[in-house]
Amino acid sequence: MAGPGAASSATAPPVLTRGVPVTQTPSHPTALTAAAPRIDTRHELGCTNTATVDEISLNGAPVVDGPAPDKDLAPLSMSVGTTQLWRFVNAATDAFLDLALIDEAGKPVPIQVLARDGSPMIDDAGHPTDSPLTTEPQLVPPAGRIEFLVSAPALDQKVYLVSHAVDTGCTGDSVPERRLGILTALPYTADAAQQAQVPPRTTSPNMFAGLLSRKTEHKRVIAFAEYPRPGDEDQTDFYIAERRPGVALVPYQMNGAPTITVPADSVEEWTVENWTNEVHAFHIHQVHFRVLSVNGQSVVDGALLDTDTVPAATAIAAPPPAAVVPAPRAPVAPASPAPADVTAASQVAPGQVRIKLFFPESLAGDIPFHCHLVDHEDNGMMGVLRVNPRGGRNPP
């Protein structure tokens, strides 16, 4: 990535590269079994969240729940007057993170985002975009990555790396605000200056540059759904399927047929729907996509991503009889009866993320896509996209 090299100059502060992985640890031996967590799908529209808080760590240091003293936080340090490039990966099994830096007074500290999910911030033509300083929290779902520049605080100051609370839906996990680490400054030394001289690096052309200007050749609707396992309502099966006539919900099978087949060098637009009462982390291997809209709201200058958060479904009041609104189509419309506090005049509006994808010839073969909440993935919320070489059959 060109960012580190570009930041090392006579006038710019020196830059170091830091890896900041976050991992999740089970609280007990059965925490990651097929039966955990148990999701009450009988009350899709009126549920109560009783989920516990996931345990996570930062660079191996456990993250403490609730207000944490400085001594219990993962230590982060850098020389005063320098800038570091932090490469942050959310390697937790199902913990969403909403990252920010704040000072001791609770004031946000600006960062400069250079890349998401391993792809530099570029426009559709492949040119680097301006990356202004921002104090906006950065939502990083499981499997998400973000790279950003951080400037050292003063010698007598402390800065906290925090994750703000995330609403994951009424059946989702509990994600409270937590301090992840504490950043302090060390005296500036010549050794630190020499260590910070990162040589410039070049990048190969991005194969997904020009994606937005390509003609869309096919549109699909991809649906997330959850239902109690037949005969065992204590166990939930998770599904991801293309929503079109004749397609049934079937949990992923290792040796099953591909969920979707596309010809190489094709361009598609997917509407990823979430019919459940918790957010999901949509992830596709090998491919980067551009987000076009979220819940109908257009996204401008979105980053190239391979992972994004799909909002939870919501209960909405039925429109007046004169209005014409398409009803949710089977088989992914919620099948369980609504609880007593939800009237028959309500219906479900799925959360939606609309994305654009390109499948180059070099990626011919099978490409998994799935929810990156590992318990969901392991219990069936996964599909396979097959990219046929030129001359292969067209998508169904």
Where are these regions (language model features)?
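Active-site-adjacent, His/Asp/Glu-enriched structural segments that form or flank metal-binding
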Residues: 1
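Alpha-helical secondary-structure segments
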Residues: 5, 84-85, 269
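Predominantly extracellular/luminal regions of secreted and cell-surface proteins
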Residues: 5, 9, 13-46, 205-241
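Residues in well-ordered beta-strands of folded domains
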Residues: 8-11, 28-30, 57, 100, ...
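Short, flexible loop/turn elements at secondary-structure junctions
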Residues: 12, 29-31, 82, 90-92, ...
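Histidine- and aromatic-rich segments of cupredoxin/plastocyanin-like copper-binding domains
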Residues: 16-20, 31-203, 299-301
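Surface beta-strand/loop "capping" patches
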Residues: 77-80, 206-217, 261-265
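Active-site pocket scaffolds in enzymes
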Residues: 109-136, 180, 215-396
